[in-house]
Each structure stands twice: as structure tokens, then as C-alpha cells.
Amino acid sequence: MTYIVALTGGISSGKTTISNGFKKIGINVIDTDIIAKNIIEKNLQVSFSIKRKFGKKILNIDNSINRLLLRQYVFNNHHHRLWLENLLHPKIYQESKHQIKMTQSNWCLWVVPLLVEKKLEKKAHRILLIDTPVKEQIKRTVRRDKISFLEAKKIIALQSSRKTRISLSDDIIFNKKNFKKINLYIYYFNLLYSHLSRIYNKNKTINIKKNFLTKFY
């Protein structure tokens, strides 16, 4: 059975940088954002439902769905956001399970930004959190997505708090400005998770306390 490490963190925390680092050393990465993107773009039934629900306001000139506009639109409406989540999340989870099952590396990295919000923490054997100060998240989100300060603040307010994410995580990388030692992080955690994977596949149990934290600051 595949040993699953869930990578999570708030918006603009640096999850992609870390997941790409693991990918470069051969770890299978299952990214729910990429899965969601593929479902929206390639599942005709899903794309038709979204277009019918939200109309032209979330479309590009070529009639394809603009995911950034879609995200901004649903964040402003609780009912629309729930509708979209109910449409996408079951499909995202099913595809995640399929990709995890096909894993070839010693362990796999399951990238789930909404791990805590969707109460999926028990679906992974270990949780790695990328933790970032809220002010830094807002600044990065405004710069990356070209949205206003208030829009970025609203998105972050809808996510779980840093305190909640930290309380549920096993390992933490604190990313305030940049990853100066990213290769060290990747090297260390690959050794740790490969070791835990071997123990798990041999005994099916690992006697490490849930709140045993490995922190990198």
C-alpha cells in the first residue's frame, strides 16, 4: 500500500515550489489543483455545467473557462462556491485515489490545499505543512493573481487558520520570504518519508506520535 504524505498550506504559501522539488527527485506528485484544472478543461459534462451555471462572465474569448475569473466569482457567493465544490470535489478525490494507486515511488506526495477545510487529513499517513504569515500570503496573492488587497484578504479569510493547520500537521516548513534551503528540505523529508514508508509497509503501523513535529524555519 502506498504511503501518502499530504502537502497543504494556505494560498501563496509555496506549495508548488516544494512539490516541484520532490518531483525533480522522482517522487510521484498528485496535485489536486492540476486534477481540478484537467477536469474543468477536459470533462465536457463538467465544463458544460459550469458554463450553464455562470454564463459568459467566467469565459475567455475562445469560450473556454477562465479559472481565475471562476475562482474570483464563486468566492463572492457562498452558494455558488458550494455548488462548484459539490460538482468538482468528488471527481477530484476519485482521480486522486486512482493516481495514488498507480504510484511507483517509495511514497507519494498528495498536494491538497483544502485538506483541513474538507476534513481529509485522515486520508493521509503524514501531513507536511507549508506555513506562511498572512501578510506575506496577501502580498504574494495580489502580485501573482493581480487582484486587490481586499479580494486576497477575503480568499484567505475563507480558508482554515494557520493555528488550525499547524495543530493538524506532523511536519512544518515555515516560508516567510523564500526557500533558501529548499534542497535541504527536500533531501531531509525524502529520507524521512522513505524510512516511514518502509516501516509502514513492513508493519502497517508507525509508533510516532501524531504531533511529533519536524520544523524548518
Swiss-Prot record:
It is an enzyme of class 2 (transferase). It is found in: Cytoplasm. Gene3D superfamilies: P-loop containing nucleotide triphosphate hydrolases. ATP binds at S12, S13, G14, K15, T16, T17. GO terms for molecular function: ATP binding; dephospho-CoA kinase activity. Residues 4-203 form the DPCK domain. One of its GO terms (cellular component) is cytoplasm. It catalyses: 3'-dephospho-CoA + ATP = ADP + CoA + H(+). InterPro entries: Depp_CoAkinase (IPR001977), P-loop_NTPase (IPR027417). It holds the Pfam family CoaE. Pathway: Cofactor biosynthesis; coenzyme A biosynthesis; CoA from (R)-pantothenate: step 5/5. Its main location: cytoplasm. This is Dephospho-CoA kinase.
